Amino acid sequence: MNFLLKISRGIDAFTDFIGNHVTDYIVVLTIIVGFYNVFVRYLGRFIELQLSSNVYIELQWYLFSMIFFLGFAYVLKHNVNVRVDFLYANWSERTRAWVDFVGTLLFIVPFCILGIYVTIAPVWFSWGFLPNGTWGGSIEWSPDANGLPRAPIKSMIIVAFALLLLQAISQVIKYAAIISGHVEIAKQIAAETEVTAVE
């Protein structure tokens, strides 16, 4: 169990790095690009020139999408997803661990695997590969003039499912540890999922 808990800690550290640092920079970039879009649109109206471009508009929604794609695993780790817990809150740590263990194994893990499986072919084709595996010569682009390629943002869907799957595996390890009597893991999860009430 100690070896598995080391793996779980490594996955948790990676998830926290993505959720705390990478997404922070993406949020800042999204704000900058959004501000630029608004500024040049109004400036363009004022001076009667078209200054805005589909590149920046699409870049803004690509970045916005990436915040969510990269944040799913972080949400799972810190248990800040929507939960109807009028029963769950009154259960013992071990009972909660059993419910989370079974729920994660039966729902989240298969959902991630299915998501990756279903997404691989469209992403593969968007990079220009044909069904027989040969490269067709061009990647999928936005249908809008001056748009961005679609392949990179479609690839982020697979990355999101993979990160969520990794974190689900980490959670399963932690729940199994609680079930087998590792009380310190229950305390660790409680500390990670503590959300300060906003007043």
Predicted regions and their residues:
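Alpha-helical transmembrane segments and membrane-interface helix-loop junctions
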Residues: 1-199
